[in-house]
Amino acid sequence: MPKMKTHRGAAKRLRVTASGKVKRFRAYKSHLLASKTPKQKRRLRHPALVDSTDRRRVARLLPYEA
């Protein structure tokens, strides 16, 4: 069986933690920020974890990381 290819777009956006969880960046932080409150923007700074329901989908995109 040939090697599986890593989805390069996913590899640039997602990181696997030491415990095996998948970390992602939050959306809505690139433009149109004047209308968002400072609290909203502050919360968007911190990364989030990919939901457990999407973990199998991410594992297919990142076969050697997840």
UniProtKB/Swiss-Prot annotation:
InterPro entries in UniProt: Ribosomal_bL35, Ribosomal_bL35-like, Ribosomal_bL35_sf
Superkingdom per UniProt: Bacteria
Keywords: Ribonucleoprotein, Ribosomal protein
GO terms assigned for molecular function: structural constituent of ribosome
Family in the record: Belongs to the bacterial ribosomal protein bL35 family.
Xref: NCBIfam families: rpmI_bact
The protein's name in its UniProt record: Large ribosomal subunit protein bL35
Gene that encodes the chain: rpmI
